[in-house]
Amino acid sequence: MPKVEVYRSILLGKIGKDLTDCELVSILEMAKAEICEFYTGNDKIKIEFNDTNRPDLWSYTGLARQIKTYLFGQLPSFEFFSTADNLQKFYGEILVSPEAFSIRPFIFGFLAKGMICNEQMLETLIQLQEKLCHNYGQKRKRVAMGMYSSASIEFPVSYVTCNSDYRFIPLGMDIEMSIKEINKRHPKGIEYASILEHFTEYPLLLDYNDKVLSYPPVINSHDIGALKVGDTDLFIEVTGTNLEATLLSLSVVACDLHDMGFEILPVKTVFPKETPFGKEIICPYYFQNTLEVSVESVNRMFGSNFTVNDMCLDLKKLGISAYFKELDKFYIIPPVYRNDFLHEVDVIEEIMIGRGLDSFKPELPKDFTLGKLSQIEEFSRKIKNLMIGMGFQEMIYNYLGSRTDFIEKMNIKSDEFLSVANPMTEGYEYVRGSIVPDLLKSESISSNFPYPHKIFEIGKVALKDLSSVDGTMTYDNLAFLMADKEFSFNEINSLVSSLFYYLNIEFKLRESSQTLYINGRGADILINDIILGSFGEVSPYILSNFGIMVPCCVLEINLNKILH
């Protein structure tokens, strides 16, 4: 979970109220945070957040904004945001080339002026940058941020691509290096170049005079890519692979700089093709949608009889605007710096926090039950021990993923897959119907580790099933992957035989027609003429979709069918 360091005196000064340590500890519960360390000899404290969905809190300005709103009920206002119906005046442009759009498509920025950047501001911005990129940005893969002194930049800025021989002086060095050299020798290149390892061209940010700003998401340039104490005019840009995550990250930084006293000047990004928010987007940009909430659902969840007005006042403490047109429902307007409302349950949680956890009296359970492991759980644990004994490493994945990974890269149809109605990001669009895509994704980022690779997971998958009450069916599956240039159908066939031998289960094989496998090198597993799963050598086409260069064999079987 993210941890941030803040100066206690600056935080309280920004809140506008002197709080004791006990009072501060108590009120931080509202932000799902706790003080994990008081530094002796200085004014710093370290705060740990128990939620990764609130990047707006990962700085003293964002945290102070939330506490101030909670204590005094004043909704913050940011007039510099554009909306679909109200576009702000822009003070610079970012021009995106088709080539850059195909690699790392989204880039947005803004200018900030009017304050002298002091040491504490710079420390706060660098810390926010690190937390945004590492936690929310998935180690820069989804989102990365760059900060510059705009005094050295001539607009418009161009977001283009270059080959691996392109040379510039990267931040932290005093000599020119090629992109290839940066990737292999620069500390940041060693750490982050793998994000772009499947591309032959690389993103580059240039100003109007072709001066290099950065090689995103890896490293800024030495000349104008370093922010220093004393800088007054700033240019902030965020690149990413997810549109809403990139926009939100930029919004968070813009709100923080505004709260520090900077004037925020919007910048327009011009894309080579349409995006869900248009071909031209002036940022910071408010893109969040209102969410409808049922009053009955709230009261049923709490066992209460709150009025709509009560609920709106509770939400206001969290910075959330709400209005109602009907007595039985109301609508929330997310703050510009938040995008974590997927379902009305998320709003109900905010009402609970705004009202105060102490206002709800705990009740002891009225029923008594005895618990024990289910049959499928006992069976799964037995198989897990067998897999570990055969040299496999266990993996644990999310049940949600992207259409790209689950469907497109696997070269299958989406007919049986369950899609999420209101996905927060593109990475959570579908419920997985197979574990194999997750295993292949892990293998795609493991090429630097010694072979052979042997990984497995026992987990749940879900598919459409019109015969069930809710139209879906959830199964417990085992899947494993073996990767090495020496592995073939014979090796995985031997492992499958060993697994079923130790389970004392007889089975039959027949050739599989799945496009996942090389023709003639895949087999379905049958017991009593019922297909339990399949295994085989993965097709080179699918391996190339995941960027895997080493032969892989996979197996996936339905454990529920084995039991029943």
Curated annotation (Swiss-Prot):
It comes from the Bacteria. Keywords: Aminoacyl-tRNA synthetase, ATP-binding, Cytoplasm, Ligase, Magnesium, Metal-binding, Nucleotide-binding, Protein biosynthesis. Mg(2+) binds at residues 340, 346, 349-350. The keyword Ligase applies. It catalyses: tRNA(Phe) + L-phenylalanine + ATP = L-phenylalanyl-tRNA(Phe) + AMP + diphosphate + H(+). GO terms for molecular function: ATP binding; magnesium ion binding; phenylalanine-tRNA ligase activity; RNA binding. Residues 286-362 form the B5 domain. Signal peptide: none annotated. It holds the Pfam family tRNA_synthFbeta. GO terms for biological process: phenylalanyl-tRNA aminoacylation. Its main location: cytoplasm. Disulfide bonds: none annotated. InterPro entries: aa-tRNA-synth_II/BPL/LPL, B3/B4_tRNA-bd, DNA-bd_dom_put_sf, Phe-tRNA-ligase_IIc_bsu, Phe-tRNA-synth_IIc_bsu_arc_euk, Phe-tRNA_synthase-like_B3/B4, Phe_tRNA_ligase_beta2_arc, PheRS_beta_core. The keyword Protein biosynthesis applies. Tetramer of two alpha and two beta subunits. This is Phenylalanine--tRNA ligase beta subunit.
